[in-house]
Amino acid sequence: MGRQTHSRALSVWANGERVGVWRLPTRGPMEFAYDPAWVASPAGRPLSLSLPFAPGNVVHKGPRVLNYFDNLLPDSEAIRKRIAQRYQTDTLDAFDLLQAIGRDCVGAVQLLAVDDAPAGVERIEGTPLSDSEIEAMLARTVSSPALGARDEADDFRISLAGAQEKTALLWHDGKWQRPHGATPTTHIFKLPLGLVGNKLADLSTSVENEWLCLQILRAYGLPVANAEIMTFGKQRVLSVERFDRQLHSSGQWLLRLPQEDFCQVYGVPSHRKYENEGGPGVLDLARILQQSVSAQQDIETLLASQILFWMLAAPDGHAKNFSIRLLAGGQYRLTPLYDVMSIWPVEGNGPNQWSWFKAKLAMAMWSRSKHDAFRDVQRRHFNTMALRCSYGANAEPLIQRLIEQTPEVIARVSAELPERFPGKVAERIFKGLKSSAATLGKMPPA
């Protein structure tokens, strides 16, 4: 590709207010400048803690700008390639991709041509879809378009971060709809993962696995995204209600709620989402959450999640799977938990399995050294982390509570399993959870 010969720009909007301009100069690093009216607005707040309001409205430049916007996109290069092919973008760069699909991003952000403005923000518009139409849409999500093929869905452009195949729709008036104009989506549809990783672990039941893990966390008292298993024709999905959407008090339109994940908070690229790849860890998250409007509760949720990830053998609790809701006046708080999956249903050393002995937490427990392998983590490490996170002298009351809750949690969630829920998934997750709780209960606290 030849050298860029002219400056390019996209305008950034939130709920009908212009936030600023993202610019790609002909030379030098990319830039982001807040609109003075947004800085002065009662709704105004930084896009990210890594891109704060600054005296004199100084323009932000460089990697933090790129990494904020790049983190709005899917992590997977294969998914990015499909987006580029479908919308015929010149490159896989964040600017090109978001120019094509940035109308409905995570949080409040909409990206439009620099001279455009979102129309119809204060109304809800959409086209109702039948189950067969949704089934066809889901099939298109995981396929590359035929040469020269275009259809109405090509004008439905959304950007969903993460490594998993997914799309999103609007739920309104008791119907699934494809939103129009400035109307946002309200639910994310996540498709089964299939074979994953170097050993091709069989996560074809990822929809049921994630649903069950979320119900378990909720039963322990942790805030989680609302989710439901749904079937459209032959296609099974996990429908996740977006907690970055809210019906306006008038009941007439949907608000987009500002939020960011912890890669964006720290201005790091998505390929560094795991701590062992240079990404944020538990102490980094806790450092931010100490200034939350609900600091003690948020840090407890963070610590409880790590204990339960260990009990569930859930290895994917990385920085992109924790987010903060950005509030007015520069305040913030932790969002509900999301994207949690256990390896217990596929644990083993054979083909299409995932060895527990080799699996790790995405974020390590630190004492005098690093402990992230499931087999190495001890109760005392959770206690040390509680002290280092300024939660308390230790995590013993929290640990004991989680252990004591486990039988009731298993009984309650087991009673709520949907019809035809795969027995192996439930049995192995419940068995692993019960065994981990017993093991944790026998470990010395120090």
Describe the residue ranges of each PLM region.
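Anionic ligand-binding catalytic core segments
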Residues: 1-319, 323-446
